[in-house]
Regions:
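A generic structural signal for beta-strand entry/edge sites
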Residues: 17-19, 53, 134-138
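A short, Lys/Arg-enriched interface patch at domain edges and termini
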Residues: 61-90
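Major-groove DNA-recognition helix of helix-turn-helix-type DNA-binding domains
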Residues: 29-53
């Protein structure tokens, strides 16, 4: 099972542009459910509770991600994937850590692709991080080399298909 597990509901799909849930934010940010709920309590994250679940518009999520109290925490979580990979001297199996910087791309489309594929593909030994750095999307993948390379290859195949249309 991957670290950031998300089951996308049909009526509140991450890719529909309507709402994000807390579980979506944990996947995107790497922050824990509890940390995100603390940001809600502090008023840093705004949302609406519907049927017992917090819902956030894309605008609310973007404002949250850009908040000066939140962004450093997210960056620390993302960078921890790389630091942990380098610091771990005894690995139980082969592992790979890849940082993919994609300048001048549709950042939302990149995030959606990786979130969707990780949650709907056969990826069980992979850790994922995404950040938008200026005009660049940054994807960090860590885990089983076969899974990491498969996911990267799928992204480039999809990217080539979309660019040729």
């Amino acid at each position: 099972m991957n670290d950031f597990e998300m089951n996308i509901d049909n009526d509140l799909d991450l890719f529909s542009g309507h709402y994000y849930l807390i579980k979506h934010l944990t996947l995107i940010t790497g922050l824990t459910d509890r940390t995100i709920r603390n940001y809600l309590t502090m008023g840093i994250l705004q949302g609406e509770k519907i049927n017992g679940l917090w819902h956030f518009t894309p605008e609310q999520v973007e404002e949250f991600l850009r908040h000066p109290a939140v962004h450093p925490s997210i960056l620390a979580k993302h960078n921890a994937l790389i630091y942990d990979f380098l610091a771990e001297s005894k690995k139980p199996a082969a592992q790979m850590c890849m940082v993919l910087d994609l300048p001048d791309v549709d950042k939302k489309a990149v995030a959606q692709f990786f979130c969707y594929r990780i949650n709907h593909g056969d990826f069980h030994q992979i850790h994922f991080s995404f950040d938008a750095v200026g005009t660049m999307a940054r994807v960090i993948l860590k885990g089983d080399p076969t899974e990491v390379m498969t996911l990267i290859n799928e992204y480039y195949q999809q990217s080539n298909i979309n660019n040729s249309l």
